[in-house]
């Protein structure tokens, strides 16, 4: 609400189709300000779950653009949803990391100063971000705001080149001819080099600076990445070098790739096994959702046994009993892991412990 003093009050959208200028910015700024003041809350990590909510809605054929023409009060109310808030804020974060924090700040400052006590269209923001950076944001950003959905980017190594291809991601496996101007941050895990690319066509060839590219350096892009089997195995060798957000995105992207048959179940399960020792509650929230979906598709006791074994290492560290010395994050993590183990492992002694507590 404090952020709305600038985004919504000082500068106000001209019409309801631009409500994302208020709400997406407020959602982003609350994280930026809180992270600067209370870094121990790790709110950037929380944005992973917000983006996942946006993915879930935007992967459906019934999705809508972040910005669309509003003609009735009912349509105005429809704007206040996960696409305006969660997708809008993470798209802004994606462009902040692509053009650079200082360039992004400069563009936003100029936007607020130029249009203070006035009303704006989205194009006014895009033009200021274009002026502040080396990229034509006024051509790139509309592909994310004016059309529904988002892409999945396929990655291939071809001799000395890197081939990137895009298609629209839909959870039912279908697609259409939508294209995005995709800002891509790449980190080469083997050479430690980084570079930025802009994928504007269905498929493009780029020069590569290493053999093990991790797409979406930092983990903030609003698209999925599908790696070849060979690349996924190579990236797995550098798993410990990825930060929390990158690990989250690697698992989420691979899970979504599996769901539309772009990677094999064997490759996905090999990757998933690397996460059993992770201590981030958001990663475990993602893992819990994955196992829940798997079990709905294949409700077999062998899968339940696998899930139980997956949880064991973390349970041994966390324990099942509440501790006053635990941090908030550790308490939340214990709740997630214990709940997952209790639901699928068929460990009666473990479950009876919690039944006794309840009674």
Predicted regions and their residues:
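Short linear capping/connector segments at secondary-structure termini
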Residues: 48-49, 108-111
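Zinc-dependent metallopeptidase catalytic helix centered on the HExxH motif
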Residues: 1-48, 337
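Short, solvent-exposed loop/turn segments at the edges of secondary structure
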Residues: 21-24, 50, 59-61, 86-87, ...
